[in-house]
Amino acid sequence: MLDPNLLRTEPDAVAEKLARRGFKLDVDKLRALEERRKVLQVQTENLQAERNSRSKSIGQAKARGEDIEPLRLEVNKLGEQLDAAKSELETLLAEIRDIALAIPNIPHDDVPVGRDENDNVEVSRWGTPRQFDFEVRDHVTLGEMHGGLDFAAAVKLTGSRFVVMKGQLARLHRALAQFMLDLHTEQHGYSENYVPYLVNQDTLYGTGQLPKFAGDLFHTRPLEEEADSSNYALIPTAEVPLTNLVRDEIIDEDDLPIKMTAHTPCFRSEAGSYGRDTRGLIRMHQFDKVEMVQIVRPEDSMAALEEMTGHAEKVLQLLGLPYRKVALCTGDMGFSACKTYDLEVWVPAQNTYREISSCSNVWDFQARRMQARCRSKSDKKTRLVHTLNGSGLAVGRTLVALMENYQQADGRIEIPEVLRPYMRGLEYIG
């Protein structure tokens, strides 16, 4: 959520920056609402003061033995006017808040300007894609060869965009997640967390999934039903519960940064993705991911983004998977992000790079929604923290890349050395 004061005092400047990401801010409407808010605010305060004054006069008139009925009627009328003004003001403030909640974050000044993924800027590459001397099989074919990926069984159990993993491929999938967690906790300084997979609406508002992206979530009950303690949604990413751990908290600056990680399933409806990536593990309704979250001082967030992206890169480097680092343009960034790097891993069967990690600096956008603040040791003043999140990595897509990049001519899959301790020394699947 953007700073309301900024929207009130510099709407044109905000609109200009948001236009770079393809968002049109209705400045005229905002101004009109703000002017009406000021009028109602003054009207409410004046009515309250007048009512208080008249109420005091009733006591004085009564003490003098005067007829207080006219004053009482006047106070009642003022009370009705005050209630009406308060009601209108509350409705207006709710409308302003709804508009504010639908406004995306302002892109950082060094984010490349563009409309979509075609305007993203490649920053660097690591590794050289392998040249195969045999016909490359995709991960679906390899999975079927080894009996490890059963999409038909998942359709029977649930539906499309799900999978049943079996045997050594299921073990390899688990090994990948364990390897990522061990790397981030033992070498990168993150604390491991186990979090709920169901969260309430306040939590989803905090990180920006609600109200704009309600259709992307799996809800336990229809959203239009009255919210209560049982109105949950499945998490689309561990970013949601991890980041909300600091909601309504004031953190001593000396305790920052806070670096957290978690391995969870993620659940997404993939609304708007009909017909895209229908084969295999690339786009699923349920997939596993190891997430990284950092809570930092505002002045440290840009450096933290570079660090976090490097942590995700380290996973790919240790696995020996070629990838490229891409700076997302303004039109391709997520709703809450002010700057984002994507890591795209080489997928041989598709002869292209595919996203496997997205690392974002969210600035104070989520912190303002969550009222997550830090306190200075010197002057005891509080300010909003900055939050960052990144995939470290998407486990299913890492499995895809590993299977295809490490496949052998006979269909066997070589296991990278760093994973063999998690596979009881196994060198090949198949």
Curated annotation (Swiss-Prot):
CDD domains linked to this entry: SerRS_core
Record bears the keyword Aminoacyl-tRNA synthetase: yes
Origin superkingdom: Bacteria
Entries under SUPFAM superfamilies matching the protein: Class II aaRS and biotin synthetases (SSF55681), tRNA-binding arm (SSF46589)
Catalytic activity, EC: 6.1.1.11
The protein's annotated pathway: Aminoacyl-tRNA biosynthesis; selenocysteinyl-tRNA(Sec) biosynthesis; L-seryl-tRNA(Sec) from L-serine and tRNA(Sec): step 1/1
GO cellular component, one term: cytoplasm
Catalysed reactions, as listed in the record: tRNA(Ser) + L-serine + ATP = L-seryl-tRNA(Ser) + AMP + diphosphate + H(+); tRNA(Sec) + L-serine + ATP = L-seryl-tRNA(Sec) + AMP + diphosphate + H(+)
Amino-acid positions noted as binding ATP in the UniProt annotation, renumbered to this chain: R268, S269, E270, E355, I356, S357, S358
GO annotation, biological process: selenocysteine biosynthetic process; seryl-tRNA aminoacylation
Keyword Aminoacyl-tRNA synthetase: yes
Matching PROSITE patterns: AA_TRNA_LIGASE_II
UniProt xrefs under InterPro entries: aa-tRNA-synt_IIb (IPR002314), aa-tRNA-synth_II (IPR006195), aa-tRNA-synth_II/BPL/LPL (IPR045864), Ser-tRNA-ligase_type_1 (IPR002317), Ser-tRNA-synth_1_N (IPR015866), SerRS_1_N_sf (IPR042103), SerRS_core (IPR033729), tRNA-bd_arm (IPR010978)
Cellular location(s): Cytoplasm
UniProt: L-serine binding residues: T237, A238, E239, E291, S391
Pfam families assigned: Seryl_tRNA_N, tRNA-synt_2b
Keyword terms, alphabetized: Aminoacyl-tRNA synthetase, ATP-binding, Cytoplasm, Ligase, Nucleotide-binding, Protein biosynthesis
Single GO MF annotation: ATP binding
Family: Belongs to the class-II aminoacyl-tRNA synthetase family. Type-1 seryl-tRNA synthetase subfamily.
Subunit-structure text: Homodimer. The tRNA molecule binds across the dimer.
Protein's job: Catalyzes the attachment of serine to tRNA(Ser). Is also able to aminoacylate tRNA(Sec) with serine, to form the misacylated tRNA L-seryl-tRNA(Sec), which will be further converted into selenocysteinyl-tRNA(Sec).
NCBIfam families, per database record: serS
Domain notes per entry: Consists of two distinct domains, a catalytic core and a N-terminal extension that is involved in tRNA binding.
Protein name: Serine--tRNA ligase
Provenance organism: Klebsiella pneumoniae subsp. pneumoniae (strain ATCC 700721 / MGH 78578)
